[in-house]
Amino acid sequence: MLIEILSEDKSGAVVVQRLAERIAENEGVEVEVNVHPHRGCGSLPKDMTAAPPKFASSLLDLLPAKLRAYNKVYGGKDIILIIAMDSDDNDPQELRQEIYSCASRFAPDIRSIVGLSTEEIEAWMLGDKAAVCDAYPDCRKDILDSYEQDSVCGTWEVLCRVISDNAEELIEIGYPAIGHYKALWAETISRYMVPQKNISPSFNTFKMALITALKNPVPIYRRRVF
């Protein structure tokens, strides 16, 4: 089975890829996983039937066009398409529904699932405390234990304070420089992450959707005329 992952950035890509591979392995399904990171989240275009702007590079800006292309090439084949991103300051339920609606419209012949981490992908990493501690044995366990799972609290900043000695300096620097560190944390922590042990509600929503799709990758959408 083929799994294609569209992610908003490189740090999210490695986490989702490794977790998807481990979930599939636990379910006894052999998969080939391809990951396609983008430059940020962006927003769904007002005219989703139009070609994207020439220099568009964010996930949602390109999503309708990419869904059309995937449906043309892979429609009806043994494939799962994962759309993975952070909810940031959006309402997770509303954003998830918008993405599923877009997928049903432009890729009705492909089984698509949404991996939406609450606020940021670091919520999924913080959902596996053992993985954080294994990756960074000298981490601040007091800060780790005080984190309220999947709360909107500046999640990457929490992880930064858990694992970095110069956290406040890094937080002050912020974007775009922090992107390098976020990718490093994701690469390191995801090596140790175990799907069955993760307590993040948003991760477990994704996990159950993927398990369901692995058992029956038939598209759940009926063709409709828009």
Model-identified regions with their sequence ranges:
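C-terminal accessory helical subdomains adjacent to catalytic cores in phosphodiester-
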Residues: 2, 13-226
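Conserved SAM-binding loop
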Residues: 5
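Helix N-cap/beta->alpha junction signal
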Residues: 8-9
